[in-house]
A protein has these predicted regions:
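Beta-rich catalytic cores
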Residues: 4, 31, 60, 127-129, ...
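Acidic-and-aromatic substrate-binding clefts and catalytic sites of carbohydrate-active enzymes
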Residues: 25-27, 53-57, 170-172
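Blade-loop segments of beta-propeller domains
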Residues: 32-35, 41-71
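Blade-edge beta-strand/turn elements of extracellular beta-propeller
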Residues: 41-53, 104-122, 154-170, 203-212
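Catalytic-core region of carbohydrate-active enzymes that cleave or remodel glycosidic bonds
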Residues: 181-184, 192, 201-212
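Extended, polar beta-sheet/loop recognition surfaces of beta-rich domains
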Residues: 218
């Protein structure tokens, strides 16, 4: 069966879509990452399963990026790595892991240093999942928004492997998003939108640390 979509990206003439997938039955569970590609977003070709469960757990939600500058060192011979950042779930806890591909997502290698984030002890909570990662050009860093306990946390990294906690915003639940939008179409006046699966959102400013506009109203 097929569940949440994630990791939508465009690379070298193809759109890539990953999704939670149980290849064994129609019930929820045994999560893998399925993979499909398209050149027009209308017609899709289903590819072999991208990510399988391992000793860290089954494969929950996450995101995918192209490491054009080879910050991770995974790229070879001028080919940038496609890197998946995902939650591995097991009965004890949820941890964040990465895997990479050098053949446009057809085969994947999991990072030997997984997990890259294990924050159960920090939050005294098993609920640490759904990493959304993007490249923040002004700072020259990767940024991760991660659902932890009762809100979204922000981490940053130079290499997709080593992550530094920056801040935490309460009031959100699962599947975080953080993106920049122009105000009334004015690209010189932008706001950052932090969003959660419940439909909750905040507007604010972002430069590695996220500050909600609501804070100015308190």
């Amino acid at each position: 069966d097929v569940y949440k979509r994630q990791g939508l990206l465009y690379y070298d003439g193809e759109y890539h879509l990953f999704y939670q997938h149980n290849p064994y039955e129609r019930d929820w569970g045994n999560m893998h990452w399925g993979h499909a590609v398209s050149n027009d977003l209308i017609h899709w070709e289903e590819l072999p399963i991208a990510l399988y469960p391992d000793e860290h757990g089954t494969v929950f939600s996450g995101s995918a990026v192209i490491d054009y500058d080879n910050t991770s060192g995974f790229g070879k011979n001028g080919i940038p790595a496609m890197v998946a950042i995902y939650t591995a779930d097991n009965p004890e806890k949820q941890v964040q892991c990465i895997a990479y591909s050098l053949d446009k997502g057809r085969t994947w290698t999991k990072y030997k240093g997984n997990p890259v984030i294990d924050s159960k002890a920090k939050w005294n909570s098993k609920d640490t999942r759904d990493p959304k990662v993007f490249w923040h050009k002004p700072s020259g860093k990767w940024v991760m928004v991660l659902n932890e306990r009762d809100g979204h946390s922000i981490y940053n990294s130079d290499n997709l492997k080593d992550w530094t906690f920056e801040s935490h915003i309460t009031g959100f639940w699962e599947c975080p998003e953080l993106f920049e939008l122009p105000v009334d179409g004015n690209k010189d006046n932008t706001k950052w939108v932090m969003y959660g699966a419940s439909g909750t959102y905040m507007l604010g400013v972002f430069c590695l640390l996220y500050t909600s506009d609501a804070a100015d109203e308190l």
